[in-house]
Regions:
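Extended, alpha-helix-rich binding/interface surfaces that flank or overlap catalytic cores
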Residues: 27-92, 96, 100-108, 115-171
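N-terminal amphipathic/basic-hydrophobic helices that include classical n-h-c signal peptides
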Residues: 1-29
Length: 171
């Protein structure tokens, strides 16, 4: 009787975990966006269209990428969010800003470049891989805390990113 009670308790625990896992997976798949928002954004451009999705993803994760919020999105959702973060950071401050804002690992330590290639953005994927080489070789220095002056000096120190940023803007 004691053994069967223990087995029943274990099964209940695993059933609860399984239900929680399935619920989590279903919730991931059920992120919804308003059709009217998509239609409006489609008329404004591709960046705005993507933004409709990524804004919803940010809402789901509470605006923060943490170990606790990462599982709330699928790999595809993370890839689209990573693209939007990449685009915004490069457009407003380049690779140095992207890395200093804490997104280096999110972009370069995950299969982001591979997914971009699989989605058909082959030249963009190559660009991300080239930036990853610079990032990997200089990660410790690129990620260290800096004053505003030290941050601005990074743009001279890491001119290797300049050509990649220009290539991205030309895509």
């Amino acid at each position: 009787v004691c053994f069967s009670e223990n087995v029943a308790v274990l099964l209940d625990r695993y059933r609860i975990k399984l239900v929680a896992l399935l619920n989590n997976l279903l919730n991931k798949a059920m992120i919804e966006v308003m059709e009217s928002a998509l239609q409006k954004a489609a008329g404004e451009g591709m960046d705005e269209f993507i933004q409709v999705f990524t804004d919803k993803y940010k809402e789901v994760i509470g605006g923060e990428l943490t170990a606790d919020t990462m599982p709330l999105l699928t790999g595809e959702q993370h890839s689209l969010l990573a693209y939007q973060i990449f685009r915004d950071e490069i457009m407003f401050g380049g690779f140095c800003q992207l890395i200093q804002n804490g997104y280096g690992g999110y972009i370069f330590d995950n299969p982001f470049a591979k997914v971009m290639r699989l989605w058909g953005a082959e030249e963009f994927s190559k660009l991300v891989y080239k930036a990853k080489k610079i990032y990997d070789a200089n990660r410790k220095d690129l990620e260290k805390e800096r004053t505003d002056d030290e941050f601005m000096a990074m743009y001279e120190q890491y001119e290797a990113f300049d050509d990649l940023e220009e290539a991205y803007l030309d895509m």
